[in-house]
Swiss-Prot record:
Reaction equations catalysed: (S)-dihydroorotate + a quinone = orotate + a quinol
Protein name according to UniProt: Dihydroorotate dehydrogenase (quinone)
Lineage: Bacteria, Pseudomonadati, Pseudomonadota, Gammaproteobacteria, Moraxellales
Cofactors: FMN
Organism: Acinetobacter baumannii (strain AB307-0294)
Pathway given in the UniProt record: Pyrimidine metabolism; UMP biosynthesis via de novo pathway; orotate from (S)-dihydroorotate (quinone route): step 1/1
One term under GO cellular component: cytoplasm
Amino acid sequence: MLYSLARPMLFSLAPERAHELTLSMLDKAHKLGMMRQTVEAKPTTCMGIEFPNPVGLAAGLDKNGAHIDALAGLGFGFIEIGTITPRPQSGNPKPRLFRIPEAKAIINRMGFNNDGVDKLIENVKASKFRGILGINIGKNADTPVEKAVDDYLICLEKVYNYASYITVNISSPNTKNLRSLQSGDALTELLQTLKARQLELAEQYNHYVPLVLKVAPDLTAEDVEFISAQLLDFKIDGLIVTNTTLSREGVENLPYGNESGGLSGAPVFEKSTECLRLFAQTLKGQIPLIGVGGILSGEQAAAKQQAGATLVQIYSGLIYTGPTLVKQCVEAMT
């Protein structure tokens, strides 16, 4: 109700300014004790972790983990922060975020703007949140792709003791050549190296933190087969399906529809759900799947579950539907 009143004002602002203002308003409401949405318990076990409910916040909304406590008040079963990189970086030039309200869509080319992994850890330590926290890791834009593994290792080692699970993001279209890590020897080397280090860290801390891969929706059936085989070979703990798409289907003739970047929101639902279905058929339940992409209703969250997801995540849907979407999704899922 409150969001439906605030939305016209927020949509009158530049998208990035509205994003900042929304988080600021959430923080203030949380501090005043006004931010507590009651969501039914629906315990879901995934990757050896019991989630209070299967609906999470996707990475990208809180890149630096600076708003965890306020976001927790919306009733999410888990929160994923990031994408974080070893060193701070400003991301791509503005404007880099575009609403397409006619299609309930967003195009972004943010470029992993963040304050760096050390600042994120400071924020996590300052948070009172004791729920399930995913940390999404990436590489710096100026790190050559052939040295990308080094950046992921730095982040993995630093966040390991602060995360419930760690997501390896190799699917953003907004960092040059990043998606090349989804194929061939590059993926093999990345997964092999990170898995070996994960096991060493588990021994060091006497605590196992699951490792999750996040992939793009713009994959062929052959890509799905290859990635699935790699996930099984290296015993990766989970897969997030999917990130944003490079396709412009559904927005090509709309204002901002041809801006470069990743498309999210309603137009990516079918594409990401089909990708999810393909991975589910290939992996046959051996690795749990987290469905994300275009969820704007409880029915769509349930559809992700029917396509093979154990958990779902939302982000763009929150912008168009508001925080009640969390409750709708939890109620619709089994």
